[in-house]
């Protein structure tokens, strides 16, 4: 995907999507509501839509020219602070009020509407387009290779943030949630499956494929790691038990001698000393007089552990109760 971030590549893909006439308003309304500002110059109402992404600026310019009879300029400024990126400004210099009214952003008397107008998102395709515009304007998504999955859309206004969340949940069941931030509000997704669904909803199919590819590999790697960790833990437990058993058997041998043990315990004790690395199942296959189950071998080894502990404590041992 080159040096661009996953979020940048996703947005680049979205700016190439063809928009149906009925969806143009929805996408443009989101882009302008979230990235636009108005000002007055020579008694004219100007609309400035600002972005640091050249492809998004071209997208806004194209949608405006395609859908409206307005006078539009495209300006480029250089940021002087921190990252000296270009800032692109799409400026509407004529027909601003009519445009904002048609996009349900401004009412009569220059009053702004922050919630999403139901009129703009009546069709499913228009709902998708509004969400696409919102993601282009204020969205970000973590690279799927990072430690946590996260997608969010930032909005300055609570009312817009809540209506955005409602649109995502009511129409597409995305389990989106909202959160207040220092300078505004976010609608966000944390579940990998829901992020994948959102990418599909807004038409980012190449990004979705990459996201799913990385997610499958990552989940597989996590499963393998969990399996290895589990196997390692079990192995460590088995080794620890075997070492304890050998130590106890040697203590019995040094204290009273293995010959004092009942025959069945004596045989297991000698086998465990001779074959310290084998499993209980393998020990069970080595005994004379037929195969013994793992639980049977484990029972005898526990009895040997008990005898060793009683010897250490100086307690009497009744070998008749040892089996």
Curated annotation (Swiss-Prot):
UniProt function note: Involved in cell division and chromosome segregation.
Q: Which GO terms describe its biological process?
A: cell division; regulation of sporulation
Q: Is the keyword Cell inner membrane assigned to this protein?
A: no
- Which InterPro entries does UniProt cross-reference here? Homing_endonucl, Sporu_reg_WhiA_N_dom, Sporulation_regulator_WhiA, Sporulation_regulator_WhiA_C, WhiA_LAGLIDADG_dom
Q: Which GO terms describe its molecular function?
A: DNA binding
Q: What's in the keyword line of the UniProt record?
A: Cell cycle, Cell division, DNA-binding
Which NCBIfam families has this protein been placed in? DNA_bind_WhiA
Query: Which residues, as ranges, make up the DNA-binding region of this protein?
Result: 279-313
Q: Which domain of life is it from?
A: Bacteria
Q: What is this protein called?
A: Probable cell division protein WhiA
Family per record? Belongs to the WhiA family.
What's the source species for this entry?
Anoxybacillus flavithermus (strain DSM 21510 / WK1)
Name the gene. whiA
One protein family per Pfam: HTH_WhiA
**Gene3D superfamilies attached here?**
Homing endonucleases (3.10.28.10)
């Amino acid at each position: 995907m080159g040096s661009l971030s996953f979020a940048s590549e996703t947005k680049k893909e979205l700016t190439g999507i063809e928009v149906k006439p009925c969806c143009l308003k929805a996408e443009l309304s989101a882009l302008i509501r979230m990235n636009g500002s108005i000002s007055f110059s020579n008694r004219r109402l100007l609309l400035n839509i600002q972005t640091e992404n050249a492809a998004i600026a071209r997208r806004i310019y194209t949608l405006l020219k395609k859908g409206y009879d307005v006078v539009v300029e495209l300006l480029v400024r250089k940021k002087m602070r921190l990252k000296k990126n270009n800032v692109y400004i799409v400026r509407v210099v004529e027909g601003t009020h009519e445009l904002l009214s048609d996009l349900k952003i401004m009412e009569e008397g220059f009053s702004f509407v922050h919630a999403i107008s139901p009129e703009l998102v009546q069709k499913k395709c228009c709902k998708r387009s509004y969400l696409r515009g919102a993601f282009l304007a204020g969205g970000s998504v973590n690279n799927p290779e990072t430690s946590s999955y996260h997608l969010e859309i930032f909005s300055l206004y609570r009312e817009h943030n809540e209506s955005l969340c409602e649109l995502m949940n009511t129409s597409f069941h995305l389990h989106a949630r909202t959160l207040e931030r220092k300078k505004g509000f976010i609608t966000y997704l944390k579940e990998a499956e829901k992020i994948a669904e959102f990418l599909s909803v807004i038409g980012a199919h190449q990004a979705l494929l990459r996201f799913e590819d990385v997610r499958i590999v990552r989940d597989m790697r996590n499963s393998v790691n969990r399996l290895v960790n589990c196997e390692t833990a079990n192995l460590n437990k088995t080794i620890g038990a075997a070492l304890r058993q050998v130590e106890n058997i040697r203590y019995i041998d040094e204290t009273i001698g293995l010959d004092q043990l009942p025959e069945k315990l004596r045989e297991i004790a000698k086998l465990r000393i001779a074959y310290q690395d084998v499993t209980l199942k393998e020990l069970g296959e080595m005994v004379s007089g037929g195969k013994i189950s793992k639980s049977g071998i484990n029972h005898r080894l526990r009895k040997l552990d008990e005898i060793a502990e009683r010897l250490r404590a100086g307690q009497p041992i009744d070998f008749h109760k040892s089996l």
